[in-house]
A protein has these predicted regions:
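Glycine-rich, basic loop-to-helix element that forms the pyrophosphate-binding segment
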Residues: 326-343, 581-598
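C-terminal, non-catalytic tails of nucleotide-sugar-dependent glycosyltransferases
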Residues: 216-260, 477-518, 641, 652-680, ...
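Basic, ligand-binding patches in group-transfer machinery
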Residues: 1-239, 248-251, 255-261, 279, ...
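A recurrent flexible, glycine/aromatic-enriched loop bordering the glycosyltransferase active site
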Residues: 333, 341, 391-420, 433, ...
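Short aromatic/hydrophobic "clamp" motif used to bind/position activated sugar donors
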Residues: 348, 603
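A short, conserved alpha-helix in the catalytic core of glycosyltransferases
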Residues: 421, 431-457, 486, 617-621, ...
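Conserved donor NDP-sugar-binding/catalytic core segment of glycosyltransferases
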Residues: 360-392, 464, 610-654
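Short, acidic, metal-binding catalytic loop of nucleotide-sugar glycosyltransferases
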Residues: 282-292, 539-548
Length: 800
């Protein structure tokens, strides 16, 4: 036997060899590739007649492909021959054949992923950026259940750089109709990548996916660009330019200033302020379109002669500038308190000595106050002023969120407080230096007055070596002061909770609300009765640290015998009951039935295909749900590869948007939003907790929603009653998305979802028209981009 080589070419990280085989023995040809003792991926594709194409990765090593003719038994296998694969030879011949043998090249290049072979393809659908690597995700076309054991990643030198046994959908009951979704982490900076799968006998399946160096870099860059949020947007300055006040608009604002508008006291503590920073700061106040202000300059370093001279120069030119000179530095809190005592304004604005303002910030604040004179506190969106004078890293903030402000001082700038409200709180002492503004926000929030957010970039926070904007380690004491500020706030309110630093992140705080051990939770779990799914669910619950809970499964009577038998064999200390109904599976109705059977104080509605990520998950959820002002608390759900499924839900245009979907759960995302406890528009239905009394007050779930938007409708009903809807990432779960909560086929699922969506839009049209107060309207109106916290750019039309 022999193998005849008829031609070579390459493309897309693969090498293609056209060969002729003697098939007279009627046996099936197979190819096996190796480099030394290392087995490598390879594919043998039939072209026509006795001609085949050997497909191998474009590795920078000498590969050897053996071709065997297989019979029914192992002893019937016949060695047909081998070919040596030298990548450098293919580089030369591919160029020549591309010109001289075009028809041959067109016939064999990409043969393994085109035509009828497309159905057997191994694809890579994209990459998700993560720290020091990428998550590659794709599909293996319709393998038999359990036949694929592992996906392996190689670099261009045939070195194994990643292995994964993670398949995202291998638990689906209708798996046979599906492609197998894989996920594997690979390193950055590779000069090429090959992804291949091996079966449970250790053999490579035929198809594999390759990227040459250029293609891999392109995929890497594309993934970072695709997932880049607004804070990383390289075109942000273009966006800012199109949203800043124009000269014409400034002129109009100056002519519209109402008589009797509030006086703003802009308080600036100065400490060794660089002269250029001072000029920028003071000029930005002088350029305000709203004229009714005073600038209080508290100079704690009068020995800085040049700075003192510059201060006096500015004060002599405008009577609205007032200087308070101290004998020495009292610390940021003490210096600020002196400025407050000197202020005579209706509102106190706290302005850092090295930052700058947009010219319309006071006008926008005055306009908001004119519309609502009872506003106690105002803040706006902001960005960073880089050392080179450019602007970057915009912070688009939500409206006031009490849970988020306990997590971190996202309010930040330009913090402006009604003087009358300030006089009702106790001034902070030096122990809160570095967190004095945060403490003030928390104290003002306790008054119960109005807190207003102006969703415009009106403040520029300068990045410098001594500012926390550029170096969070520049004020190491500030995080400890922040912990104290939040703890004192909770203590004043009589809320039993412990505050600590959140996962070692600067200026981030974790609040653990204490849970009464007598509080009982009922886990209400609608199920289709898949025993493998239920077994995994129970195993996931066994590590739960909080012990006072029960499970209420809800199922159709057609599967009840299997569920009851499974429950009887469960080794759990907690009670498990089964609510059985003859009714067709309707998620909302099944949840209502389970709630009626539940004995707990707090209902935790869960899908049966979730797995808690931390032992404290339930105690964390109960801590939030037990708060009287909270109506419902939801969690982060993740895919098995630790990419985020959702980190809270928003509403954009006409769609419910799963926030941060597809991003790496270990990355900060947009300004740590996915990792931040905060109030949200709605919680996801995979797992959420609510007090039973609140559930009954709302009137249970609306059974008009069959399988979709049940938790969204419930969240909106709670918000209408004045309850908070809270999201916490500290109680995250894996969501396998195996169980289908619809009685329809695949086409029917879409129709049912559309019907449920129409019901949601109809029922809540007035509320939905107001948008999502917890999601900044500067983000994109395209749901997919909004999910990634991206902004839209106005594309300029050019004429040729």
């Amino acid at each position: 036997m022999s193998v005849s080589c008829l031609g070579r070419c390459r493309g897309d990280g693969k090498l293609y060899t056209l060969v002729r085989l003697d098939l007279s023995m009627g046996k099936h040809p197979v190819a096996r590739n190796s480099y030394g003792s290392l087995s490598l991926p390879c594919n043998l594709v039939h072209l026509e007649g006795d001609r085949f194409v050997v497909v191998t990765p474009d590795f920078r090593v000498k590969q050897r492909v053996e071709i065997w003719l297989e019979g029914r038994n192992v002893e019937d296998c016949v060695f047909a021959g081998s070919i040596k694969i030298n990548a450098s030879r293919y580089a030369v011949e591919s160029k020549l054949n591309g010109k001289l043998r075009v028809e041959m090249c067109n016939a064999i290049r990409n043969i393994d992923s085109s035509g009828i072979h497309r159905e057997l393809a191994f694809t890579c659908d994209g990459f998700v950026p993560k720290e020091n690597g990428l998550i590659a995700r794709g599909e293996i076309a319709k393998p038999e259940r359990g036949s694929i054991a592992e996906v392996i990643a190689f670099d261009s030198a045939a070195r194994i750089v990643g292995r994964s046994r993670l398949f995202l959908n291998d638990g689906l009951s209708d798996y046979s109709d599906c492609n197998l979704n894989y996920s594997i982490t690979v390193p950055c900076g590779l000069n090429g990548l090959c992804l291949a799968a091996i079966d449970n006998k250790g053999r490579y399946v035929g198809a594999f996916k390759c990227f040459n160096g250029k293609a891999y870099k392109g995929a890497f860059d594309l993934s970072w660009s695709y997932y880049a949020n607004a804070a990383d947007d390289p075109r942000y300055e273009d966006w800012l330019a199109s949203h800043r006040l124009t000269a014409a608009e400034a002129s109009v604002q100056r002519s519209l200033v109402p008589e009797g508008g509030p006086l703003f006291s802009v308080i600036v503590p100065l400490y060794k302020t660089p002269l250029s920073f001072f000029r920028d700061m003071a000029d930005s106040v002088l350029q305000q379109t709203y004229p009714n202000w005073e600038l209080i300059l508290v100079n704690s370093t009068p020995e800085e002669v040049e700075l003192k001279s510059l201060i006096d120069s500015y004060a002599s030119k405008d009577a609205r500038i007032r200087v308070v000179e101290l004998d020495g530095n009292l610390g940021i809190t003490g210096n600020t308190n002196v400025g407050i005592e000197a202020a005579s304004g209706d509102y106190l604005c706290f302005f850092d000595h090295d930052d700058t303002l947009e010219p319309d910030i006071l006008f926008e604040y005055a306009r908001a106050i004119a519309a609502d004179p009872q506003i106690d506190l105002l803040y706006c969106d902001e960005d960073k002023l880089l050392p080179n004078g450019h602007y970057a890293m915009p912070t688009f903030k939500p409206d006031f969120s009490i849970d988020m402000v306990r997590d971190n001082n996202y309010i930040c700038h330009l913090l402006t407080v009604r003087a009358e409200a300030y006089r009702q709180i106790e001034p902070s002492g030096p122990e809160l230096d570095g967190a004095q503004d945060h403490a003030m926000v928390l104290k003002i929030s306790e008054l119960g007055g109005h807190i207003h957010h102006v969703p415009k970039i009106l403040y520029h926070w300068r990045i410098s070596e001594t500012s926390t904007a550029g170096n969070s380690d520049s004020k190491p004491y500030a995080t400890q002061a922040g912990i104290l500020a939040v703890q004192q706030h909770l203590d004043r309110l009589g809320i039993a909770a412990n505050v600590s630093n959140s996962h070692g992140r600067a200026f981030r705080y974790r609040v653990d609300y204490r849970v009464d051990a007598s509080l009982k939770a009922s886990l209400v779990v609608p199920t289709r009765g898949d025993i493998d799914v239920l077994r995994c669910f129970i195993e996931g619950l066994q590590k739960t640290s909080f012990s006072n809970w029960e499970i209420v499964f809800v199922c159709n009577d057609s599967v009840s015998s299997g569920v009851l038998e499974f429950v009887s064999g469960c080794d759990l200390q907690q009670d498990i009951s089964v609510a059985v109904t003859p009714e067709q599976f309707v998620l909302s109705a099944y949840c209502n039935l389970g709630a009626r059977k539940a004995n707990g104080d707090i209902l935790v509605f869960m899908h049966d295909d979730v797995i808690p990520g931390e032992p404290e998950w339930l105690e964390t959820m109960l801590g939030f749900a037990a708060r009287p002002e909270v109506g419902v608390v939801g969690t982060m759900t993740r895919h098995a590869d630790n990419t985020i499924q959702q980190a809270g839900l928003s509403f954009v245009r006409d769609s419910i948007v799963p926030l941060a979907a597809g991003t790496d759960a270990c990355s900060p995302g947009y300004l740590f939003f996915p990792l931040t406890v905060r109030n949200v528009f709605a919680v996801d239905g995979a797992c959420f907790a609510t007090r039973k009394k609140v559930f009954e007050e709302v009137g249970c779930f609306d059974e008009g929603f069959h399988s979709s938007y049940v938790s969204v409708d419930y969240s909106l009903a709670l918000a209408k009653l004045g309850y908070l809807v809270t999201y916490t990432p500290e109680a995250w779960l894996y969501h396998r998305s195996i169980t289908r909560f619809s009685n329809m086929g695949r086409v029917g699922i879409s129709a049912e979802r559309i019907r449920d969506k129409a019901a949601l839009l109809g029922k809540w049209s007035e509320r939905l028209s107001q948008g999502d107060a917890y999601f900044n309207h500067n983000f994109s109106l395209t749901p997919a981009k909004a999910s990634r916290y991206q902004v839209d750019h106005e594309e300029k039309l050019t004429c040729k």
